[in-house]
Amino acid sequence: MKIFLGILIPFAGTTFGAACVFFMKKSLGRSVQRSLAGFAAGVMVAASIWSLLIPAIEQSKNMGAFSFFPAFVGFWIGVLFLLLLDHLIPHLHVGSNQAEGPKSKLNRTTMMVLAVTLHNIPEGMAVGVMYAGFLAGNVQITAASALALSLGIAIQNFPEGAIISMPLRAEGESKKRAFLGGVLSGVVEPIGAVLTMIAAQFIIPVLPYLLSFAAGARLYVVVEELIPEMSQGEHSNIGTVFFAVGFSLMMVLDVALG
């Protein structure tokens, strides 16, 4: 039951964030969007380092001087995997008027939801890998560290849920449809977590590769989506400040609970 709840925690963060559409004005201000994107980016970077890359390297210490190898390979596979999905799936980032991926007749709303859904895949995989490692009895991964990652992703997903539902509302969608769009973008997380856990049961020896794969995919999202989003418009430091807030919060959470 604890593992089931741990898998659902990130999805709950997205759902609560999407619910902001019922309580806030029709659109988010530029400074608020920058702050939310910066905060989410900071959480993702810290979680990728402390919860994924460092455990991946520690689990490969028996390789001696080459203990970096699984983390290096998994990281690059994660980056290339997201790069491939970016080219295969039509999507539109929030705040952008130019669609990415193959040409499509999908409307703006659908492509905006697809963009967030696409980049939520690594979140579910990260949680699934952590709980798979815990179930396998991996000494570097405890129930507390897996929970810390779930909580961190949920904290990050709250602003991301608002970032998708509020623009959908601004696009002319009803509050209910905007909320559902935000919720649907996060459904892939528990699904991805469960599928990753099932797969990991059969390939535990490559757990370090899976951990670093999730890290590479997450950092791809930060650089490709969140950093540009927090830097849009006139120069401002608010995105950078909230990046630092998110990073330090996730660092404390991971170390304190891990």
Predicted regions and their residues:
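Intrinsically disordered, metal-sensing/regulatory segments
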Residues: M1-G258
